[in-house]
Amino acid sequence: MDSEVAALVIDNGSGMCKAGFAGDDAPRAVFPSIVGRPRHQGIMVGMGQKDSYVGDEAQSKRGILTLRYPIEHGIVTNWDDMEKIWHHTFYNELRVAPEEHPVLLTEAPMNPKNNREKMTQILFETFNVPAFYVSIQAVLSLYSSGRTTGIVLDSGDGVTHVVPIYAGFSLPHAILRIDLAGRDITDYLMKILAERGYSFSTTAEREIVRDIKEKLCYVALDFEQEMQTASQSSAVEKSYELPDGQVITIGNERFRAPEALFHPSVLSLEAAGIDQTTYNSIMKCDVDVRKELYGNIVMSGGTTMFPGIAERMQKEITALAPSSMKVKIIAPPERKYSVWIGGSILASLTTFQQMWISKQEYDESGPSIVHLKCF
């Protein structure tokens, strides 16, 4: 493999697709993992209307489109739309010819086997890539924090995973998944804003609520205490201007929405919170590795970006752990992109170059080669 050609790194998330070149310190392109199709027949002839739109363009025309996310809960469910997203990534965002660059893709932990094969097949057969590799998202986050052992809490838009990793290998028996992530927090925020009299219902309005969430929400260190403070003073209240100029006020909703991460029962989900799930995952690991895991709890993904989340996590895990245990939460400022950054680091290592699946190997063995070479 020629060392002159930069590998491409694509992190396909349920909410956002992050793409760029190996060796860069941040992704060049970050756009919503959305494919939109017109809701109505176009009447303006020669308007150059397309039958589908991807990413930001779909987002900006969201008023006239039906938006679909091909990745649900971290796993690809619609391959035709997924192909459109990859096509858009190569040709419109990165402006590269995929047949000239090795491609590293990321996948969710516990991704079904046939999904990995399908991914491999599309990249080699549709896009003709010269070499390919697929890597587990949480493992890449750990790499980007400079560790090979630790437990990663990766929470994005569609799914949250807790993945313990020892010496670079994930421990599959202890991986836990919670189907509760950013999109659910946004939906919950829509619901509690409705109780205040602000109604948001369409897919387009949901994006406004997502923006409110990202700009104003935070995690309370002590929920009950914070609720009390909020009821007695207006210190918590903030205002937000909607696209039409109307200004709304948001109070205890700011911390009530992200609280769902610690108490999924408010969403009528029978799951344990992210704190309890992290603890449960550690307890499923061998007793000899637990100490190292408690001391290396790494947060990654956009849903871990709420102010106050690391402090709250520290408090909750310390309460669950044995009393003498040193608990350390690592929440790097760039954690929104740490999966991508880890991929960028991995794909540019000289030692990694023999790990790629080459087109020749694919032609000889078919899609199942991915299970032999990527783990």
From Swiss-Prot:
Subcellular location: Cytoplasm, Cytoskeleton
GO CC terms: cytoplasm; cytoskeleton
Gene3D superfamilies for the chain: 3.30.420.40, Actin, Chain A, domain 4
PANTHER family: ACTIN
InterPro entries reported for this sequence: Actin, Actin/actin-like_CS, Actin_CS, ATPase_NBD
Listed name of the protein: Actin
Catalysed reactions listed for this entry: ATP + H2O = ADP + phosphate + H(+)
Species: Kluyveromyces lactis (strain ATCC 8585 / CBS 2359 / DSM 70799 / NBRC 1267 / NRRL Y-1140 / WM37)
Catalytic activity, EC: 3.6.4.-
Top EC group: hydrolase
Keywords: ATP-binding, Cytoplasm, Cytoskeleton, Hydrolase, Nucleotide-binding
A molecular function (GO) term: ATP binding
Function: Actins are highly conserved proteins that are involved in various types of cell motility and are ubiquitously expressed in all eukaryotic cells.
Family: Belongs to the actin family.
Pfam families per the UniProt record, alphabetical: Actin (PF00022)
